[in-house]
């Protein structure tokens, strides 16, 4: 069945597209002047369509973010940003440094090559009229050629500018087994030694996978564990919120070669080589969502209970021959690992004590290659703690993504605040520099299905000015986590004047939906209440000072670019 449809209301356009991409049998003589005329008309039409703009719908919902918008090629074909296929169509893709691109969804596999018309769709070699191309550092692919392979239809109407991507049949079906190692999407196994740094090894190993195989970087564990701002020594351990806070505040990551592990020293002056702008915290024991994250986004950091401490340890819960671990007791979590794959058919008989059914996650450990299967092992789906907390780092950008970050919550999400109901308002006030425009804000969703509206108030003098707010963005987060929201339109900020960013947040089932930084215990002794001006409100009309009345900072950052 043909699964992509062209809706073209102007017959001349249809004829032009046909003439430019398909030859009849026999010999057709065309002189250079004819070819130039056809090419010129195609380019002009493509330019007109792109200038008018295309509206993208995926499964009936409009995709409003500009970063996902397609464009019309000079051959009058749709070119779609590769990341849209991952983020909106739940495909997985890998870009290799040699230009090869592999895109998968369900059983379909499309193999393309950057700047080449040679392709392989479901094992068959084909020629495509438009080669994948890099444009403004983004990879675009000819979607109508591969939509069928990915179980999607592609309908577009040149007259209205509407592009519709609609899945065919069931939701994405994950394979029964998947292993990031086979896809070249993991970095080397490392050894934490006798320090309590598993949490940082897991966080950074997961972070590294989000870049692979296009970029292969190794990040510094010493820098994360010794420069995070928390009052914790390396031997004392840590957890994922510390990792997110360190990364979200742009303290890191830095490269391992610039701050090597195990030398008992660090360099706090190093600059982050990447900027984390988003991390998803997946629902408790949502195994399907964890698999989808591994398949489409990157390795997933999770925590387990382990009575082993290194590669030389043994445990009644660990089968050394099969490298299989299953714990069904009541002890709490004490060790972080990274999920890099799964096998639904991994036999329950591989474990010392058989869980109720087959199935296991493939996990990367931080005890060196002498442990397990070259540093990896299998954890049963039915382990007491696997996937209770699952973190995937989903938006890691270059260190030049914004010119400036405004923040007062360098320790990140320490606690929560609210008014005993699921929604609330919170705001942060900052003083702009010269010639700046506000591009984005970031904050935490403390649980799944959180909705938000983001507002901006310029020329702030007191809380009365918060009533003069302008709506600049809205949306929903599927999972808890840390998110950066791009504004619908940039906001020019008055030079050296105060401005306020305001969020109305709704978290179903929550009584305290606002993430805050405060002095909770000895770990947060470095908390600085003097560096922020935050406010909270129930209805957005009466505001309370976060610092003066609640002794906290609200977690709400702002990102700007220079205009000159």
Where are these regions (language model features)?
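Short, low-complexity patches enriched in S/T/P/G
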Residues: 1-3
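Primary recognition of N-terminal secretory signal peptides and signal-anchoring hydrophobic helices
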Residues: 5, 16-176
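Sec-dependent N-terminal signal peptides
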Residues: 7-12
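Extracellular/oxidizing-compartment recognition motifs
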Residues: 85, 146, 471-474, 553
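Catalytic-core signature of thiol
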Residues: 168-479, 512-519
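Short strand-edge motifs at loop-to-beta-strand transitions and within beta-strands
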Residues: 481-483
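Noncatalytic modules at the cell exterior or secretory-pathway interfaces
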Residues: 491-503
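Short, surface-exposed beta-strand/loop patches at domain edges
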Residues: 504-564
